[in-house]
Amino acid sequence: MAHSKTRANDGKITYPPGVKEISDKISKEEMVRRLKMVVKTFMDMDQDSEEEKELYLNLALHLASDFFLKHPDKDVRLLVACCLADIFRIYAPEAPYTSPDKLKDIFMFITRQLKGLEDTKSPQFNRYFYLLENIAWVKSYNICFELEDSNEIFTQLYRTLFSVINNGHNQKVHMHMVDLMSSIICEGDTVSQELLDTVLVNLVPAHKNLNKQAYDLAKALLKRTAQAIEPYITNFFNQVLMLGKTSISDLSEHVFDLILELYNIDSHLLLSVLPQLEFKLKSNDNEERLQVVKLLAKMFGAKDSELASQNKPLWQCYLGRFNDIHVPIRLECVKFASHCLMNHPDLAKDLTEYLKVRSHDPEEAIRHDVIVSIVTAAKKDLLLVNDHLLNFVRERTLDKRWRVRKEAMMGLAQIYKKYSLQSEAGKEAAKQISWIKDKLLHIYYQNSIDDRLLVERIFAQYMVPHNLETNERMKCLYYLYATLDSNAVKALNEMWKCQNLLRHQVKDLVDLIKQPKTDASSKAIFSKVMVITRNLPDPGKAQDFMKKFTQVLEDDEKIRSQLEMLVSPTCSCKQAEGCVREITKKLGNPKQPTNPFLEMIKFLLERIAPVHIDTESISALIKQVNKSIDGTADDEDEGVPTDQAIRAGLELLKVLSFTHPISFHSAETFESLLACLKMDDEKVAEAALQIFKNTGSKIEEDFPHIRSALLPVLHHKAKKGPPRQAKYAIHCINAIFSSKETQFAQIFEPLHKSLDPSNFEHLITPLVTIGHIAMLAPDQFAAPLKSLVATFIVKDLLMNDRLPGKKTTKLWVPDEEVSPETLVKIQAIKMMVRWLLGMKNNHSKSGTSTLRLLTTILHSDGDLTEQGKISKPDMSRLRLAAGSAIVKLAQEPCYHEIITLEQYQLCALAINDECYQVRQIFAQKLHKGLSRLRLPLEYMAICALCAKDPVKERRAHARQCLVKNINVRREYLKQHAAVSEKLLSLLPEYVVPYTIHLLAHDPDYVKVQDIEQLKDIKECLWFILEILMAKNENNSHAFIRKMVENIKQTKDAQGPDDAKMNEKLYTVCDVAMNIIMSKSTTYSLESPKDPVLPARYFTQPDKNFSNTKNYLPPEMKSFFTPGKPKAANVLGAVNKPLSSAGKQSQSKSSRMETVSNASSSSNPSSPGRIKGRLDSTEMDHSENEDFTLSSPLPGKKTDKRDDSDLSELEKPRGRKKPAITDSEEKLSIDDLNKLGQDQKLRGSQRGRKRPAVVSESDETQWQEEKRLKEDVIESEDEQNSPPKKGRRGRPPKPNNGGTPKEEPAAKSSKRSKKKQTSAAAVEEEEEEEERQTENIEQKPKGRQNRSTKRTQQSRAGRSKQAASKENESSEEMDVFQSSSPVSDDVPQEEVMEEEEVSTINVRRRTSKRERR
């Protein structure tokens, strides 16, 4: 080396052979040529060439001079760089340059030349590649480690390489760059932050997207150097995350993006960083937490991520953010769930509980995204979501917000179509989600028009897609209908009914538009538009759009003709689709992308277009039924037993025969139905008869061969078929045959002659047949019918107890256990009622006599002869039959007028009967009559007595019934402003006088000033007033107050001279007045109008008499607590199984706002089936929660009563029942007047049978559950058995020395007299009633209230306390239903979270007989 140094010091530069001196004196081209030769020389040299190394040392030094390093020509610079790279290779490990500054200049120079790599198409690229390869292979830059400015050199190199890499480079370029950079990291002592930044910056999303190759280069570098670089990465994140030193790097703001990228590159890079994220998840800074949550969502959710299993503490900490207080964080967590479910099914279990809480989040967007996450995963693969997750979606179909409900419903529909309809995952998957079809249809029970329209759309697109070929579509519908639950079937039937009704409304509108324009037609058109508007979303806008559409129809004949075809009964499915397409095309405007008018009309067209059913469809459906009958169908493959399929198919056809009767008019269809009539299955034959009745109007003229074959079958069914078939056979004859009188005579005569009172088995069908003939043709058989009723029905059947009943302690038994004699008696009562409903007059006093007979049955507890032969369950049945018969007759104006007040009051007591089923079914029939506006308003007052029912859920249902009936009347008055003459019979507030009068005559109300009895009266009054006063519309509070004041100025018309009776009346008025004063702040205002009191109930006010006395005892004041009435739109209780309805929620939701799905103007009693949640989220939010119905009654305390009082009131009934002697058997129907005399004398004495009353339990929940388990073991006999004590009647009310006078028929209320109620309507009602009564039999008998065994209180003077529990089946049929648009039954699968059975808090009244 000494020699070489000498040579260098000599300063003489030796050039390779053939190369002349290279200086600034030669041209650029010559310089390049010479340099190329130098390059070639150095390239060929290796490290072992010591002589050459020494020879060219000065040349090496010369090439590093500023002349070359700063030369303006790039080719010169490139060649010099290649020389220098080879020089470093040849002279390694010692470089010929010793000056640090010179070394820095050289390496910065080489780095600058590397920029030439960028242009891969350059002719010099290979030389640039050589340069890169050389310095990478030799690791030339490692020389710089000793330099002070090494960091600057390395940083510049890294920046250069990252900036030049592009997709034109091959793998070798990439590899050499990685080699070059990795050697610097792996062999150096440290990695500066600046250098680290040059690598990490390429991972930032913005840079990553700009230069994917730089990202790949950084990724490869980090993978190669993971172990060496990890401490520096850790230090960087520690500085930024833990110490907050964001100034150390410009990348501080991208720290979370970097963590994600680094984790994806190599998780080992973050071994020490991930624990720091746990602290960040608990940061107080919302935005910071959000950033960490977003980061971890990507890390945990990535496809192959194992982070959750590797770092469980971090996973648990992350799950905790699902409950974060900051909304965007919770939203982010929920969005992450779908990726996690799809990529990591094993984590579904961990997520389920957190998603459950979030599905009840107060934020709409979060609840919405929970659904989206679950549905997205389910649509990818059903196995990814468990049943719990699907249930969360199911719950949200009842959410308060439409957007959430819609998402949930559409999600379920898509899942159903994919896995059930298209069977994409096999039968097991289809079975798992079989509940979806029922659930979606149950939503049709909702009150919101949006929900119902969406159900219709889902049905047409996802459940039975309308674009399927006809046979396929009908097969789909056939098996769907066969597998739906009963409530879903009712919903589907209602859907078709609503669509059909709307179709008729639109048809009427088109007909009106076609008429010449007059004021009358304009009014009719407006009225029709209003009706149609109510069937569309957003009634305000819909009204404007419908007016516009009406104008379009008037002006555009083509659109009108298309619409006319669409609503025609003969319109086929294909035609319907064409019409809809044409109308929307004509109304559309290409320039207007969003057209709300067109959207609204589309809604209308969707509802009225017959896209499923036409003549071809009915024919295909009949063929499908025939296949099942022949055994050639795929019933078993579809998972439906053949019998069930046939029965469901006929039921489906029956429903369609109501909505699409014209589509049945084909010989093939009628022949198939005729074959069904002859089948053994009673239900199938019944349905076939009903289809004939609905569709057979043209059979006689168009299908004579069908007529000939059908007639003998109908005769046979009417005479000897099962009762229901006999009934339908009579109605078929009435609908089909013009010679019906002849046919009726041929049936009536032989049946009439063959009636045998001793042959019970063969009496029921004749009685049913004769009853329906009497209803349809009362004049044809007037004389024989009157004789038949007087002699046979009354004398031979009702007044005779031929067989002793079975001894049992039960109060109710299933139908099959009822004695044949009682079943005959029930049919005899129904036959009398049908006869009277057919006559529609009381000219022969038959109605009066029948009412006396019915009230006598009620009065005698169902044992008309009072011989004690009838069993208790049979007596219950007869009481129910009598009570129902009176309610039925009261719906006919001519009979309502002759029902005396005593008879009405006695009938009302049926709602407090000791037998639960009697109360339940009677209330059902009462509710139906009221909701159809058939029963007079005074019958709504009977609902007040439901406050005395010991079963909390019965009270809750009664309340819902009241809400519906009040709303029905208010809605009717809104829509029919011109019915002011009916105001007395429709305005709900007018129920108050009837309620006051009924409660004043309540047999429980014995002592005028008795506090306990008055508290009972108060509860009954509040039961009605709470709902009436919920809204103070039109100053109704003042109106009610004025009404009560006016009553105090009158006397009781039932006993105007009875001082005690009048005092009771005034006392009840004072109770009502105190309730009004305590619950209203506007009661003292001027009443909007002077109330009119019913003359049958109250005398005219005496102008000389001013009754200002307060009749209440002073201590009663404390029981009137001030406060506003609860909102009437309490949703949910009526839709739950009775085991949970009415229970108070433990969450804050019970004291927060309750809002229905519908708008505030909609009927609030919709069966929203909204459950009460017992759990609340960690934040007390309630916006999305569903609400339970609190009991209408507050908890009551046990009575304190003197023993003397008790002993006096507990005496057994002392009323003597006059025996019916043999001579009385000769009574005609008119002789029943005598029978009524005793009844009138003791009419006020009969106390209602009371169910066992129970007191509230103050025991803890675990004690309650323990008792529950004990009670479950009790036998059914014990559940239904009457009270253990002897029955206690109520002390008789004093009679004022005579029988009350019968009200003459002329003294009628102002109820409107619709004389002609069609027999068909009556028959339809009866059919529905029979179905509902049948439903009662399908329930478990655990419905009765059972008294638990409690120790008696030792202290004297206290009454016993008993705890009652309702362990009722969730399958029980609810009697009081809310304003379901479908039917009076409501689906009961809506309990979304199980609730514990709570103690029913009801006071035990010692003055009353125990209730069952």
Swiss-Prot record:
InterPro entries: ARM-like, ARM-type_fold, Pds5. It is found in: Nucleus. HEAT repeats lie at residues 383-419. Residues 1350-1362 have a biased composition (Polar residues). Residues 1172-1184, 1196-1212, 1223-1241, 1263-1272 have a biased composition (Basic and acidic residues). Residues 1322-1331, 1386-1397 have a biased composition (Acidic residues). It holds the Pfam family PDS5. The keyword Cell inner membrane does not apply. Residues 1402-1412 have a biased composition (Basic residues). It comes from the Eukaryota. Residues 1137-1412 are annotated as: Disordered. Residues 1139-1149, 1156-1167 have a biased composition (Low complexity). Its main location: nucleus. The keyword Manganese does not apply. Keywords: Cell cycle, Cell division, Mitosis, Nucleus, Repeat. GO terms for cellular component: chromatin; nucleus. Transmembrane segments: none annotated. Disulfide bonds: none annotated. GO terms for biological process: cell division; DNA repair; mitotic sister chromatid cohesion; negative regulation of cell population proliferation. Interacts with the cohesin complex. Plays a role in androgen-induced proliferative arrest. Required for maintenance of sister chromatid cohesion during mitosis. This is Sister chromatid cohesion protein PDS5 homolog B. The lineage of its organism: Eukaryota, Metazoa, Chordata, Craniata, Vertebrata.
